[in-house]
Amino acid sequence: MAFAVIRACSRVGRGGLYKRLGGLPRGTRRQRQRRQGASLSTTEQRSLAPRPPTGPPARYPSPAVPARASEARRHPAADLDPPPGEPQAVASRGTPEPRPPPESPGAQPPPGPAAADGAMAAAKPGELMGISSSYQAVMPHFVCLADEFPQPVRPAKLPKGKGRLRRPRQSRFKTQPVTFDEIQEVEEEGVSPMEEEKAKKSFLQSLECLRRSTQSLSLQREPLGSCKLRNSLDSSDSDSAL
């Protein structure tokens, strides 16, 4: 025990476990770090401050510049909604159209009922398909495709009963069971003599196949029963020595 204490003291030394590192004390080190941080913050503020312009003064655009430049800088999605005075097809193409000169209010008569009916008929195919007018303006080719290739109308479902179309029995899997409705239909329709002969022949063939299979199985059992098996498959003999 004394030897272990002496060895530990020799490892630790005279100064103990916590030796002081050489250099400046802690207080001066912290002060120096604070001063460095303050100097860095002042330099960053100076670098971020705006500098006065030294070059030639910037040229401002003259008012005579057309408004197309500002329109081109707009987001492309802004062209989806056309202005109120511009037609939708022109707005979707993006080509400017010269607007008609403003006329006096009394020069053009108000639209009659025939014009209103024509406008409603033009807007009907799109509305019937569930396409809004803005969709027609953005994607007119889809509306044209729908006009060229109309969707087929689904036939109305017939009520269950004699009016229902019965699928042919030959196209069905043989393993699928026959329903009672089909049996009743056959009984009501009646069977021709040729079909009855075919049904009798198929029934006799199936009976003959069944008789042959049972006969072959009985013939196989006889030699198996006559000879004695050396290794029994019974679970009670599994522990016995062979």
Curated annotation (Swiss-Prot):
Pfam families: DUF4695. InterPro entries: DUF4695 (IPR031521). Keywords: Cytoplasm, Phosphoprotein. Induction: Expression in the hippocampus is induced by long-lasting long-term potentiation. The lineage of its organism: Eukaryota, Metazoa, Chordata, Craniata, Vertebrata. Residues 16-121, 152-178, 215-242 are annotated as: Disordered. Residues 157-172 have a biased composition (Basic residues). It is found in: Cytoplasm. Residues 50-64, 97-113 have a biased composition (Pro residues). The modification Phosphothreonine is found at T175. It comes from Rattus norvegicus. The modification Phosphoserine is found at S192, S206, S216, S232, S238. This is Uncharacterized protein C11orf96 homolog. Residues 232-242 have a biased composition (Low complexity). Coiled coil: none annotated.
